């Protein structure tokens, strides 16, 4: 039997049209829509298992518009982890992530302890690429976050994206325990090298 149940809040940010909703819908529902429908804000839940506990991923798909700064701040303050999405076909969409990243730093403080993924979506449109993966990798190193390219359309690296985000959380949670006594749960996790599994 699972020991506990808790919510883990993930906020997805990015400019309009980069595929935030497509990534979330592909992960949660396994679907992809060709048409672009602007999002104000949607929340989805996905249950995952992590060792012997059940965790509910609460994924907030935020607006790509700059008209709702209060909603953006609220999503950051409530979030446990962040996915910053740009389109590899739009350099501007990568540039637009910088103020969002800065706001996460401002609200959350030490971002080294927070799982953040920089995601280059639409890698199926490689002939129209404006952002090289090496450039995004360099930015991710500067921001001290992880990097991955995805395609919601082809279902490429979508599940892996959320899996990696959870792995970052586990690694960072474990690393925070080194200066004090580790709990039995932490010892068990390290002994088993257990991982959160996306169902």
Curated annotation (Swiss-Prot):
It comes from Mus musculus (Mouse). It catalyses: GTP + H2O = GDP + phosphate + H(+). Gene3D superfamilies: P-loop containing nucleotide triphosphate hydrolases (3.40.50.300). The modification Phosphoserine is found at residues 35, 126. The keyword Phosphoprotein applies. A motif (Effector region) lies at residues 36-44. Belongs to the small GTPase superfamily. Di-Ras family. This is GTP-binding protein Di-Ras2. Ubiquitinated by the ECS(ASB11) complex via 'Lys-11'-linked ubiquitin chains, leading to its degradation by the proteasome. Transmembrane segments: none annotated. InterPro entries: P-loop_NTPase (IPR027417), Small_GTP-bd (IPR005225), Small_GTPase (IPR001806), Small_GTPase_Ras-type (IPR020849). SUPFAM superfamilies: P-loop containing nucleoside triphosphate hydrolases (SSF52540). It holds the Pfam family Ras.
